[in-house]
Amino acid sequence: MLFIFNFLFSPLPTPALICLLTFGTAIFLWLINRPQPVLPLIDLDNQSVGIEGGARRGAFQKNNDLILYYFSDAKTLYENFQRGLAVSDNGPCLGYRKPNQPYKWISYKQVSDRAEYLGSCLLHKGYKSSQDQFVGIFAQNRPEWVISELACYTYSMVAVPLYDTLGTEAIIFVINRADIPVVICDTPQKATMLVENVEKGLTPGLKTIILMDPFDDDLMKRGEKCGVEMLSLHDAENIGKENFKKPVPPKPEDLSVICFTSGTTGDPKGAMLTHENVVSNMAAFLKFLEPIFQPTSDDVTISYLPLAHMFERLVQGILFSCGGKIGFFQGDIRLLPDDMKALKPTVFPTVPRLLNRVYDKVQNEAKTPLKKFLLNLAIISKFNEVKNGIIRRDSLWDKLVFSKIQGSLGGKVRLMITGAAPISTPVLTFFRAAMGCWVFEAYGQTECTGGCSITSPGDWTAGHVGTPVACNFVKLEDVADMNYFSVNNEGEICIKGNNVFKGYLKDPEKTQEVLDKDGWLHTGDIGRWLPNGTLKIVDRKKNIFKLAQGEYIAPEKIENVYSRSRPVLQVFVHGESLRSFLIGVVVPDPDSLPSFAAKIGVKGSFEELCKNQCVKEAILEDLQKIGKEGGLKSFEQVKSIFVHPEPFTIENGLLTPTLKAKRVELAKFFQTQIKSLYESIEE
C-alpha cells in the first residue's frame, strides 16, 4: 500500500513526465480530430410516410406540400443560369480541353452573352419567341450545347435534343413531329445527313442548320440547292450581336424542352417538360442534399453522360444555380480518366456500366490471394465506418488501397449519384467504401423529369431506390394479371407531382396510356415498399427492360425479327438489368435444321445437331444477319445462344393458352444455361 502511495504522489522523473504529457496531448488531439459520424436525419426504419389515397412521401418532408423551387430568384431555367452568374461573380462556367492540355474556361457572362447573340440571330432569321418554336440540338456534350440550350430559354423557345442512337429514321420522325425548322449541330457529318434528308424530301420543314465545327463550301452549296441555309455558329453569333434583341424570358409554366425517348417499339415519343418541371426536380434534390452537401461556386462536375437525357441536365442545372463549373470530357470515353484527373470534379454523376468497369478492373488487379485478402479487408473495414456514418478518405485503408481509385476519378469527389439502370449490391458497396464520399442511387424516368426517388443519407443498404423526393408522391397500383396488389405493398409505380410531364407531343393516345385523369404518371415499373419505407424495383409491367448501360429492350420485338431465321422454330431472348448484352435460347425447326446443318458440312440426328458447336455458331450468325436486315441495333442482338431440342409448349408450362411466352417461367427453366452463357462471355 505504501509503495502505491509513493508511486502516485512522489515527483516523476522529467523524461517520464514528458512522456505522460505527450501521451495525454496525443489522446486530446485524437479526440478533437477523430472523424465525426454523420447521424441519419430520419428514422431509417420509417423512411417514407403514408398519405391520403395510399401514396407515400419522403419522411424528411415536414408536410404534404410539394416543392416548386429552391431559390426564389430561380423559377425558370433562364433565371437559374442568371442566378449562377450572380452568385459566382461571373466566375468560370464551362470548361473544355484538348489532349494533354489543361482545361480552358468560358465565364458565366460569356456564356450568357453568346446565348443572347445566338438567340438574337434566330429571331433575326424570322423564328419566334414562342412556345411552338422548336429548336433541334444535335451534338455531343460540349460548351456550345449548353449555349444553344440557353439561347432557347433566353427567348422562350423550346429545345429539342437529338442524338445518334435515335437512328436516321427516328431523327426524321422527330424533326417532322416537332416541326423543327432549325437544327444546331456539331459536325459536318451530321449536317450532311440532315441535308440529305431534305434533298430526299423527307424533312421539308428544315430550313436552317447552324454548325459548331468548320465546314466546306460544298456542304453550303448542297444546302442552298435544297433550300437550307448553312451557318457557322460563329457567324450566327456575330449576326445576333449586330441585330441584338432584348431577352424574352419564359414563365415557369412554359415548355422548356421536348425529350424524345428512343423507344423500343413504334415511333419515338416526345415528353413535354416545362421549366417548372425541371426546376422543381432540381429543387427536390437540393432540398434532399441540404443537410450534408450544399453546392457552391467551388464545385465542379464532369459532363460525359448524354445531354440529350435529363439526368445529366439536372446535375448541370443544380450546379448552375449555385455558380458551379461544368467541365466537358474530350468526347472519347476512353479518355475520361485522363479528363477527370485534369478536372478534379467534386460532383460525379454516373451510371452502373461505368462503375462496373472500374470495379471489375480493381478486382482483376488483385491477382494474388494476399492482394484479394487485403482488398476485401479494406472494403469491409471502410464500409463499417460508412455504416457508422463516417465518410472520409484519409484513413489508413485509403492511403494503402483506395488512393489510386480515388485518384483515377480526380481525387476530390464529394458526391456521387448513380442512376439510369440498377446497380448491383457488391458494386455499390465497394464505391461507398472506396470513394470516401457520399454515394447515392436515384430512380426515375424522362416523364418525371429524371428523378422521383433517391436513397437517404445514413442508409447504406443496397437493393432499393430510396424514398420519394420532395417534389412528388409515389403510390403503387394493382396489377392483377401479374398478381401484384397494393394491399401487399406491391404494384405499378405511379408518380404525381410538380416534376410530372405534360404529355407526349401531338400524341394524346400515348399520353392517356401513361397519364391518368388524376395526374398520376404510370411508369410501367413494378415496385415494392420494403418494411423500412424504401422502394424496391421488382419487375416491369410490360415486357420491356433496361440493360446495364441504360438501353431499353423489347424482347418480343427482337424475337419476332429472329423468327424469320429459317432454322429457328422458337426463340427466347433474355436480358438482365445488371448485364450489358442479351443472350437467347433457340429451339430449331426439326424439318429445316438438317438441311441447314448440311450446308456447313454437319450431319447427324436432330439431338446431335442441337449439341453441335458449329451448328450453334451458324444459327447465331444467321440470327445476327436477320437481325441486322430487320433493323435491330447492335445492343438488341443476342451475343450467344443455347440450342434446345424440346419446343416450348402449354403442357410444359412455358407458353400461355394463347401461345405467348411465359418469360418468367422460361428464365427459371433455363436459369442454368443462362448463367453459363453469361459466364462464357467476358463483358
Swiss-Prot record:
SS bond partners: none
Cellular component terms (Gene Ontology): endoplasmic reticulum; endoplasmic reticulum membrane; mitochondrial inner membrane; mitochondrial outer membrane; mitochondrion; nucleolus; nucleoplasm; plasma membrane
Phylogenetic classification of the source organism: Eukaryota, Metazoa, Chordata, Craniata, Vertebrata
Membrane-side (Cytoplasmic) residue stretches: 33-683
Family (UniProt): Belongs to the ATP-dependent AMP-binding enzyme family.
UniProt function note: Catalyzes the conversion of long-chain fatty acids to their active form acyl-CoAs for both synthesis of cellular lipids, and degradation via beta-oxidation. ACSL5 may activate fatty acids from exogenous sources for the synthesis of triacylglycerol destined for intracellular storage. It was suggested that it may also stimulate fatty acid oxidation. At the villus tip of the crypt-villus axis of the small intestine may sensitize epithelial cells to apoptosis specifically triggered by the death ligand TRAIL. May have a role in the survival of glioma cells.
Transmembrane intervals: 12-32
Keywords, in A-Z order: Acetylation, ATP-binding, Cell membrane, Endoplasmic reticulum, Fatty acid metabolism, Ligase, Lipid metabolism, Magnesium, Membrane, Mitochondrion, Mitochondrion outer membrane, Nucleotide-binding, Signal-anchor, Transmembrane, Transmembrane helix
Native organism: Mus musculus
Official protein name in the record: Long-chain-fatty-acid--CoA ligase 5
E.C. number(s) listed in UniProt: 6.2.1.3, 6.2.1.15
